[in-house]
Every structure is written in structure tokens, then in C-alpha cells.
Amino acid sequence: MADTLKPEAPNPDTDAYAHESELDAHLQTKRMVINMGPSHPATHGTVRLKVELEGETIVKIDPEIGFLHRGFQKSCENVTWTQCLPYTDRLNYLSAMMNNFGFLNAVEKLIGLEIPERAQYIRVIGSELHRLTDHLTCVGATGLEMGGFAPFLLAMEFRELLHDRTAELTGARLTTSFGRVGGSNRDLPEGWIPRVHKTLDQGLALLDEMEGLLTNNRIFVDRTKGTGVISAEDAIEYGYTGPALRACGVDYDIRKTKPYWVYDRFDFDIPVGEHGDNYDRYLVRLEEMRQSIRILRQAMDTIPAGPIIVDDWRIALPPKPEVYGTIEGVMSHFKLVMEGIQVPAGEVYDATEASNGELGWYLVSDGRGRPYKVHVRAPGFPVLAAVPHIIEGKMLADLIPTFDTINMIGGEVEQ
């Protein structure tokens, strides 16, 4: 009889001490749900993290995306192949040239087109400039969000110098829309290479100073070493690429494993971590910046003379004297602008090594001047998908450095 009359939940007035665990389970008094985002300075984009806590331990975390969705893939179906470029800028807006060149490379592969050698060098130079700016933002923000304001200022000072050089090359600091199918729309400005060499000299000094403030800093090391750990096997299962995968000990970089453009002509190393934690991800990015500087110096010192775009009026705009002086030139110009490049029917997948990993493009053409389908495999989505696996059961304080070092960019994740 006593058992049948016993209430389902303990009476908090009389049984709190005797049945504390049952009471907690019934009333959920020890757990709290907080929101990180969708507008939060540490999320690197408008993403919401719904975090369930027990004390300061993360019991469950649920990433919610969609706040930055712009309909990228559908938008590309309504414009010409060239007009897709401004949309690609806004995927990873910290390294827009990598998006531009990756898309153009896939279109050229679909056409079966090889671009001039000088244009390939220009693409390598632009890509490595933006790899530097992306990594500087990631490393600087990681230090800032753990209390290190000086490293952030050093990173931003170097990044500003790089933005100045980028603006001289492309006409824009961030969203560049640089390059065209068949090569480049601009050549390197006169006197630009010596200015970049000087910028890299200044940047190396800033990089050394930033490393001195972070790498052996006890607070930074305690917050990053042994936190945010993911094994190489799990990273591969989730689809990790780029610095996050290499920090786990996997030596995979498309520039080495499947070289494109002229990367196979340069002497550079691929930094690989060991433990797959936040500290290794920081170290990998730090060393990648030094390797990018090596590549830039070699590319600028050995860039050949020659054309920067193919001499084919079906692909590239005719020279202005031909447009103004010949009927063939003006007709080719008009058809290319109004109808777009007529890409042969077919499909292709092509990938380049972007700052955060493999940036893959799956393109389908039906033979017209507009894409039938554009799908982008962004490196940020797999690293975000693995956040619950990495962080559940860990401390709330570990979430910020983990989210910083995986460097999820909302623009490429949500498209």
C-alpha cells in the first residue's frame, strides 16, 4: 500500500536530501540551457549554438545554421558563368580570391582549357596572399578571445598591409571578383612585386612577435593544449580537410598530393600536427603562414612574361582596339557579354586547397551560357558538424578556443 501511494516525484520539502538524485532528474535543477549566437563575436558568422550545461560541463551542444543563407547555388543558375564570381567572393569572405580561382579552375576544366603560364603564377600569388590574411584573422581572433589583445593587433597590422597589396592588384580589399575564365583580368601592377617583398619582410617581424606572445604563453597554452581534441580517424570520418585535418597528423594537402597551376615548381613544406587539439591547429596555421611567404617569394621571383588570358574571343573579351576598329571584335564582345561563355554540356568536380581545406566545385552545364547546376563543397561544414563530438563532456571554457581554431566561416557553410 505504501508503494502505491508514493508520489511519482519526491516532495521537495521532506525528501530533498533523501532523494536528491531523483529530485534533480525530475526538476532538472542542475542543468541550464544557454545560447551562444546567432550574433556573437566568437562565432565567426551568424551561427547559433544551443548549449546544455550541467555546472560548467557541456552535456549537449546543438549547432543551428541558416541565418546567413543567401541562396548561392540557385543564384548562380540565373547568371552567366562570369557573373557567378561576385557570389563566390562571399563564401569565405576572408579569402575571396581562393573562391574565385577555384570556381574558374573548375569551369576551365569543364571546357578543357589550359590558361597561360603567367596567369597560373598570378593565381598562386593571389591565393597565398589570401591564405595569409585568413590565417592571420583566425590566429589573431583566437588570441583576442582568450584575453590577448596585443597579438590581435599585430595580426591586424600585417593583414592591413596585405589588404593594401590586394587592393593594388585587384581593386578591392575583401570581395575581389578577380580573374576570368581563361586567365586573369588584370596583370601585376608596375612596381608591385618589390612592395609585396617589403610587406612580407615587415609581416615576418610581426609574425615573430605574435608567436612570441602566444606560443609559450602559459594562459594560452593551458587553454588550448589538450582541449578540442579530435583523432585522425574521427576527423577523416567527418570529412575534415585543411589545417584541422593536418593538425591530427594526416599529411594531406591538395597542393602536394594533386598539384594544380604551378605549385609543383615551388619548394615548400606541409606542417603536420600530432595531437589534433586546439594548440596543434594554432601551430599548423602559424607555420602555414611562413610557408605561404616562401611560396610567394618564389612565385614573384620566377614569374614569366607573357599573356595573362587565352587569345580566344569565344572565352575572353577582344582587345579594345579590335572592339572599336573591327566588326568581328564588336560582335564577339557583344555576344560574350550578353550570352556568356558557351560551356560544353557535361559535368565536372574540381578541388583546390583553400585556407580552411578542400574547396570543391561540382558544376553541370547544359551547353548554354549559364550554369545548369553549381554545388560547392565548403571545408567549413564538416568541421562545424563535428563540434558536438569534440566538445560534449568538456568544459564551457573550452568551447571558445575550439570554435576559434576550427575557423568555421558562416558564409561558406550556409551559402
Curated annotation (Swiss-Prot):
Cellular component terms (Gene Ontology): plasma membrane
Localization (cell): Cell inner membrane
UniProt keyword list: Cell inner membrane, Cell membrane, Membrane, NAD, Quinone, Translocase, Transport, Ubiquinone
Lineage, broadest ranks: Bacteria, Pseudomonadati, Myxococcota, Myxococcia, Myxococcales
Gene3D superfamilies recorded: Cytochrome-c3 Hydrogenase, chain B
Record note on quaternary structure: NDH-1 is composed of 14 different subunits. Subunits NuoB, C, D, E, F, and G constitute the peripheral sector of the complex.
InterPro entries: NADH_Q_OxRdtase_suD, NDH1_su_D/H, NiFe-Hase_large
Gene: nuoD
Listed GO MF terms: NAD binding; NADH:ubiquinone reductase (non-electrogenic) activity; quinone binding
Reactions mediated catalytically: a quinone + NADH + 5 H(+)(in) = a quinol + NAD(+) + 4 H(+)(out)
UniProt membrane topology term: Peripheral membrane protein
Pfam assignment, any one: Complex1_49kDa
EC number, as in UniProt: 7.1.1.-
Similarity comment: Belongs to the complex I 49 kDa subunit family.
Major localization class: membrane
Protein name listed in UniProt: NADH-quinone oxidoreductase subunit D
Keyword Acetylation: no
